[in-house]
């Protein structure tokens, strides 16, 4: 009875348009040859990517944008990791912009992290040039001046003639049709870049929506909505965002029913697409998006859903034995790609060092976390994708959206704190219809909490994965010297306070590092 009441309360808090979703699981894959209205040039580009058919979520979105739906409603997608959400919005946007008369910024894709934004840009880069579209990025990978030179086209000047800079700014044009951006750098261009305008924007994609709505990110969303609001919209406002009084160089706002350069042409409304594997159902957050008759697409009836071919497994051990169990797993997967997730940047660094101190030539681990600079993260991720390294030890910087082909195993070295964290971590494997496994290392006191987490994500089965005791005994002998090397490294690098904290963790078994000796050896 209590459970029924809880479910009813949760249902009452859901916005009405989410109560009757389109179930994507009822849609079948569709071969490119039978996909209606697909531009032949885009078909060729997709085939060059090795794509011969579209996944269900991609087919469903296509029919609501290019097909009978005709983008009459804003699209909201809640679909498992690895189901193909990026191409589900990239393909129809590129198809619709292929016939654009002149180049100007018409599509904006916003993502929470630089790594994810660069990955999405790669998808657009693979298909947009086939129909003559240009794609830019504003993610902070290069200097602001370098980005401006790629985003803004300056007029050619006659030599020997002096020009007023204010006159030149009136003739600046966009050099891109599609922009992939992170919120911070987007706001930099809105406030400071001459010639950067959202006046002609037609499509706004908010990827990883729940994370982008969780933080303000310099009020990027209300700013974008205000700058793309027409005078017609303001007659019946449904959303009143906060916008700073001035936007630096960006003074243009969307004009009423007329597009600049095409006199008399009706100005279409701004179409929005919001996507996530764990889309929020909080009305107070969703209202910020100012959605137009939104259509909700989801896979099944649950907010959280794991990939269909994912196998969940768990290992229960003493906290101090976690590294031993971890190495035993890695030894049994020679040549298979694996991502290990930890709870913090510091644990990621120490665990990576510890694995390499074991001295096993079959285990070559690299770190991927927010503690590394962008160039080093990109380097390690590239090596992992190429297969030069098989083991990546990661913080939650890699949990959302990152797509690495061939990852067959994911290990939660530290138990995920939330159901959505588990969804995003596990989703690094079993992508694009492939099989994969997710292992979670648990201490005895975490078993009950993990069982509740599994209920939330709808996992019916997560059996214990057996490891032969003989395998553990052989690894235990090399664990102690490896741990001693790690302690020496930490003490040589860390300040006095850090050394004291590490000694304290080693004595008390603090779960922040979980890299202390087995109790039998303590």
From Swiss-Prot:
Task: Cite the EC number.
Answer: 3.6.4.13
PROSITE patterns hit by this protein: HELICASE_ATP_BIND_1, HELICASE_CTER
Q: Which SUPFAM superfamilies match?
A: P-loop containing nucleoside triphosphate hydrolases (SSF52540)
Q: Motif Q motif in this chain: where?
A: 30-59
Biased-composition ranges for Basic residues?
497-506
Q: Which reaction does it catalyse?
A: ATP + H2O = ADP + phosphate + H(+)
Keyword hit for ATP-binding: yes
Q: What does its UniProt record remark on the domains?
A: The Q motif is unique to and characteristic of the DEAD box family of RNA helicases and controls ATP binding and hydrolysis.
Into which family does the record put it?
A: Belongs to the DEAD box helicase family. DDX51/DBP6 subfamily.
Protein name from the UniProt record: DEAD-box ATP-dependent RNA helicase 1
Tell me which species this is from.
Arabidopsis thaliana (Mouse-ear cress)
């Amino acid at each position: 009875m209590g459970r029924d009441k809880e479910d009813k309360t949760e249902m009452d808090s859901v916005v009405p348009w989410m109560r009757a979703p389109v179930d994507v699981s009822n849609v079948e894959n569709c071969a490119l040859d039978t996909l209606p209205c697909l531009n032949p040039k885009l078909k060729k580009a997709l085939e060059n990517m090795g794509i011969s058919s579209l996944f269900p979520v991609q087919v469903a979105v296509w029919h609501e944008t290019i097909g009978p739906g005709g983008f009459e409603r804003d699209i909201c997608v809640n679909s498992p990791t690895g189901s193909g959400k990026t191409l589900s919005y990239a393909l129809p946007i590129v198809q619709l912009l292929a016939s654009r008369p002149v180049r100007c910024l018409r599509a904006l894709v916003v993502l929470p992290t630089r790594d994810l934004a660069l990955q999405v840009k790669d998808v657009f880069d693979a298909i947009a040039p086939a129909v003559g579209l240009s794609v830019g990025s504003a993610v902070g990978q290069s200097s602001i001046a370098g980005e401006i030179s790629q985003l803004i086209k300056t007029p050619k000047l006659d030599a020997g003639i002096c020009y007023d800079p204010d006159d030149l700014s009136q003739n600046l044009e966009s050099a891109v049709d599609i922009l992939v951006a992170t919120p911070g750098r987007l706001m930099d261009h809105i406030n400071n870049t001459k010639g950067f305008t959202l006046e002609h924007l037609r499509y706004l994609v908010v990827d990883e929506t729940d994370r982008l709505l969780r933080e303000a990110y310099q009020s990027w969303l209300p700013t974008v909505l205000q700058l793309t609001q027409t005078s017609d919209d303001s007659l019946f406002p449904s959303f009143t965002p906060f916008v700073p009084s001035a936007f630096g160089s960006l003074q243009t706002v969307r004009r009423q029913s007329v597009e600049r350069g095409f006199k008399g042409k009706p100005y279409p409304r701004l179409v929005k697409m919001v996507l996530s594997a764990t889309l929020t159902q909080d009305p107070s957050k969703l209202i910020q998006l100012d959605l137009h008759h939104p259509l909700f697409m989801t896979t099944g009836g649950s907010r959280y859903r794991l990939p269909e071919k994912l196998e969940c497994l768990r290992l229960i051990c003493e906290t101090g034995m976690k590294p031993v169990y971890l190495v035993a797993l890695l030894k049994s997967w020679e040549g298979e790609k694996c991502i290990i997730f930890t709870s913090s940047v510091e644990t990621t660094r120490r665990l990576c060092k510890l694995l390499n101190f074991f001295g096993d030539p079959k285990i070559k681990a690299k770190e991927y976390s927010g503690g590394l600079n962008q160039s080093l993260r990109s380097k390690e991720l590239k090596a992992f994708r190429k297969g030069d390294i098989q083991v990546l030890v990661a913080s939650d910087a890699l949990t959302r959206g990152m797509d690495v082909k061939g990852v067959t195993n994911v290990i939660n070295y530290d138990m995920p704190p939330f159901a959505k964290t588990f969804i995003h971590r596990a989703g690094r494997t079993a992508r694009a219809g492939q099989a994969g496994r997710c292992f979670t290392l648990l201490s005895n006191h975490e078993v009950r909490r993990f069982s509740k987490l599994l209920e939330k994500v709808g996992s019916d089965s997560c059996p214990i994965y057996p490891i032969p005791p003989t395998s553990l005994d052989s690894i235990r002998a090399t664990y102690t010297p490896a741990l001693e090397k790690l302690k020496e490294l930490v003490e040589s690098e860390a300040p006095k306070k850090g050394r004291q904290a590490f000694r304290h963790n080693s004595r008390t078994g603090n779960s922040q590092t979980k890299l202390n000796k087995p109790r039998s050896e303590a």
